Design a protein with these regions (language model features):
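Carbohydrate-binding surfaces of carbohydrate-active enzymes
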Residues: 100-278
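Substrate-binding/catalytic cleft of secreted carbohydrate-active enzymes
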Residues: 2-145, 149, 153
């Protein structure tokens, strides 16, 4: 079963880059040598939450402890580093951990626990999903794969295209600072859609929609993988625009992320209210 049910079944799967022997250190050590007998690529065997074959995979270390692990000679790759239930959602703290991980040469990433909420569909309770209170509600998505709040945080932080601007104002000239975090693709394989919009007022009808004032599309700048530069969407902010939407689309037509930049009108309002403005 070990040979046919896992190794021979998955030996050519493109997503298999390690073999995981057990969980939380595991006790199947007698099987460690069996993997390479049937794997021509002889991919590394790891023991999650253990230090084995050059990988330190310890789970749920604090931010400070994680930095200490990165000073050790082994590759640091926590096979669980944020828990969807006990850490208050996968998005809580992910930015801080991820920025530390991606900048450190000894860390190659980590894993979140877990993809989907887990539970037993009770036929004796009219299909109610029983996860013993909240013990199985630790997924990025729900039991029916509905998107939860952390889904969007993860999508934003792990997007291979990152806009570094945090705000814009009425003097915005259309130029964004951008990082291309793809491993191989040039940013010019992506395209960017933008919209300047005006939001309904609280006094407007309840069915009032966001008004698109102006929109356009640009190709990504010529920017090789793992580099930074400028993306020019070639527009200035309209006087009555409340926000600018910017959407990155990958070469296959999938949305990477959509950023919303409220137009900072503080200076404009100050000028209007100040008696010195005249």
């Amino acid at each position: 079963l070990f040979r046919s049910g896992m190794i021979e079944r998955d030996v050519n799967h493109p997503s298999i880059i390690w073999w995981s022997n057990g969980n939380e250190k595991g006790w199947n050590t007698e099987l460690d040598g069996e993997f390479h007998k049937y794997d021509p690529q002889k991919r590394p065997v790891i023991h999650p939450q253990g230090n084995f074959s050059g990988f330190e995979t310890m789970h749920y270390r604090s931010y400070g402890e994680s930095q200490n692990y990165m000073r050790l000679p082994e590759i640091f790759m926590p096979t669980e580093f944020l828990h969807g239930l006990y850490d208050g959602g996968h998005g809580a703290g992910l930015y801080d951990y991820w920025e530390m991980m991606r900048k450190h040469p000894r860390c190659i990433g980590g894993f979140l626990w877990v993809l989907a909420d887990e539970g037993v569909k009770r036929v004796d309770m009219d299909g109610f999903i029983d996860n013993q209170g909240n013990f199985g509600a630790d997924g990025i998505v729900g039991p029916h794969h509905e998107k939860e709040g952390s889904y969007y945080t993860i999508k934003q932080l792990w997007s291979p295209v990152q806009i570094m601007n945090t705000s814009i104002d009425k003097q915005f000239d259309g130029k964004f600072s951008v990082e291309n975090r793809y491993d191989y693709l040039n940013l010019n394989t992506c395209r960017f859609l933008w919209k300047q919009v005006k939001f309904p007022l609280a006094t407007d009808a309840s069915n009032a929609a966001v008004q698109v004032l102006k929109e356009g599309e640009v190709q990504g700048s010529d920017m090789v993988a793992h580099s930074a530069g400028i993306l020019d969407i070639k527009t200035n902010i309209l006087p009555n625009a409340d926000a600018l939407f910017l959407t990155a689309i990958d070469p296959y037509g999938h949305e990477l992320w959509r950023w919303t930049f409220p137009v900072n009108k503080l200076n404009q309002q100050t000028e209007q209210l100040s008696p010195l403005s005249s």
